[in-house]
Regions:
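Hydrophobic, aromatic-enriched interface-forming segments
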Residues: 126-195
Length: 314
């Protein structure tokens, strides 16, 4: 399978989660083994990725959905998101039922790039990213995933100096465990009383503490709200606001795409405009984008009022 991989000028991965971190670092190791070269790693959120030109003549992309602009000679995509694009020029390694990290690790295994520590880490990443909630390791797997959500992609990358194995049993996992035991129940109790309607099918969940993804998962699992899609916000130090969308029956991705985002059917994300500074800004923006018919209806009603006034004046 790796015989079809071109020599990359760049490796690009998803910045938002552990799967992107695992995928990117594993592909760097694979490139070193195949071509004896150190290939630079870049990571993007969905909005930044869509704005990036593919200026290199060759590259590898992981954990970002395959789309027509990526169908280029000497490009390879290793991913697990749904896509309607079939490759004609690029190499596509794709499986909806495996995380991107697992797909990359399977390529590494073909060249002996394995270890018990990596076996364990890739396994936990796969559980958290695919959200295999019935797996006995699900809780600890979510603690690992929360490391990237809490500390950020590049901070963790620097902390372990690109050596994934150092994440296994890292001391910071004790922090994640404490946060899960103490913060999550408090956060869930507060958030369940603070859900705002965005549209008839989308609710905004305000959060103050705890793991947003697990809180929303419980809200959906327990049918606490009437909305099939729930949105939470995460603000990065750069000022960007990331919207995280969750559902149980595949509705989240369709909503994310309306926001120029992407992801999985039940777990997606989107970057909101930089003009969004507060939760109320976000609510106003989301309502505007996700309720176009309501806006048209209101506009038509207003137009009718003006028409009536004109007739009275006439």
């Amino acid at each position: 399978m790796t015989k079809n991989l071109p020599r990359p000028d760049v490796i690009i991965t998803h910045e938002s989660d552990l799967d992107g971190l695992v995928s990117g670092i594993l592909l760097q190791r694979l490139a070193k083994a195949l071509f004896n070269t150190d290939v630079r790693l870049e990571a993007y959120h969905y909005h930044g990725w869509r704005q990036r030109d593919l200026r290199e003549s060759a590259g590898w992309v992981a954990d970002l959905a395959f789309e027509p602009r990526m169908d280029r000679p000497n490009w390879a995509v290793i991913d697990h998101h749904a896509t309607e694009t079939l490759p004609k020029n690029a190499t596509l390694i794709h499986n909806l039922e495996k995380s991107a990290g697992l797909l990359c690790y399977e390529l590494c295994q073909l060249h002996g790039l394995t270890s018990p520590a990596l076996d364990r880490l890739v396994h936990l990443n796969n559980i958290s990213d695919i959200f295999l909630e019935d797996d006995p390791d699900f809780v600890i797997a979510c603690d690992y995933a929360n490391l990237v959500k809490t500390y950020g992609f590049w901070n963790l990358h620097a902390l372990v100096n690109g050596q994934l194995e150092k994440l296994l049993d890292h001391a910071l996992l004790e922090v994640m465990a404490v946060k899960r035991r103490i913060e999550d129940p408090i956060g869930l109790a507060w958030s369940r009383e603070n859900v705002t309607e965005i549209s008839p099918t989308v609710g905004f969940v305000d959060t103050v503490i705890g793991n947003n993804n697990l809180i929303v998962h419980q809200l959906l699992e327990q049918n606490i709200t009437r909305f099939p899609v729930l949105i939470t916000l995460f603000r990065r130090t750069s000022g960007m606001t990331i919207a995280s969308l969750r559902s149980r029956n595949g509705e989240a991705l369709k909503v994310a795409e309306k926001l120029q985002g992407g992801g999985h059917a039940n777990a997606s994300g989107a970057t909101l405009p930089r003009s969004v500074k507060t939760n109320q800004d976000a609510i106003n923006y989301l309502r505007q984008v996700l309720n176009p018919r309501r806006e048209i209806s209101e506009f038509n009603s207003l137009e009718s009022v003006f028409d009536a006034l004109e007739k009275e004046r006439g």
